[in-house]
Design a protein with these regions (language model features):
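Divalent metal-cofactor coordination and adjacent catalytic microenvironments
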Residues: 1-188
Length: 188
């Protein structure tokens, strides 16, 4: 899976984090931005804990097989806003565009289906699907996810080194896990 176009904005910005922490403008902005970047990365994208793209971004997923007629493949990152292009490597050695694909959801998972998939040629990954994933703009990201990002960034800012209480390492606040639990993909 490859991110072709990263999000144009983040769900929570530096001003929001600064306000959450009640800090003055300019105060430790470099460290704050680092904490915010880590917190967003914790939840966003293919490597994020949720298995979701938060703000619209373009991804390409490649597959080792091409389904038969009427078959489908699962896109591993949601929510899928649109399927932008599907290509199949042909026996002639070129990439053919699949027309009229259908996007459907089943059990919170996104699938792409086509009535007639082209016959693939020899290629380790003969099927490429480019799609846009994310809730929309930063304002469209569910508020519990945004709040979890704020809490996690604040935790990183305040606990600048591993915290040990009575010989045990302190963990990230449990409330963060509760905020994002309804949004987690089943396979994460």
């Amino acid at each position: 899976m490859e991110c072709l176009t990263p999000p144009a904005e983040v769900p929570v910005d530096l001003a929001q984090l600064r306000a959450h922490l009640r800090l003055e403008e300019g105060e430790e902005d470099g460290h704050l931005q680092h904490c915010l970047d880590v917190a967003v990365a914790q939840f966003d994208g293919d490597d994020g804990e949720l298995g979701l793209a938060l703000v619209h971004q373009v991804w390409q997923q490649s597959f080792p097989h091409v389904p038969g007629a009427g078959g489908s493949v699962e896109l591993m990152l949601g929510p899928v806003a649109s399927v932008d292009q599907i290509e199949v490597y042909t026996p002639a050695g070129s990439w053919d565009v699949v027309t009229s694909p259908e996007l459907f959801e089943l059990g919170g998972r996104s699938y792409v289906q086509a009535r007639n998939w082209p016959r693939p040629g020899r290629c380790p990954l003969p099927l490429k699907i480019r799609f846009t994933a994310g809730f929309g703009t930063a304002a469209d990201v569910p508020k519990p996810i945004c709040h979890a990002i704020l809490l996690f960034a604040a935790h990183l800012y305040q606990a600048r080194s591993p915290v040990v209480v009575e010989g045990k390492p302190a963990e990230v606040p449990l409330s963060i896990a509760h905020l994002v639990a309804p949004y987690k993909s089943w396979w994460r």
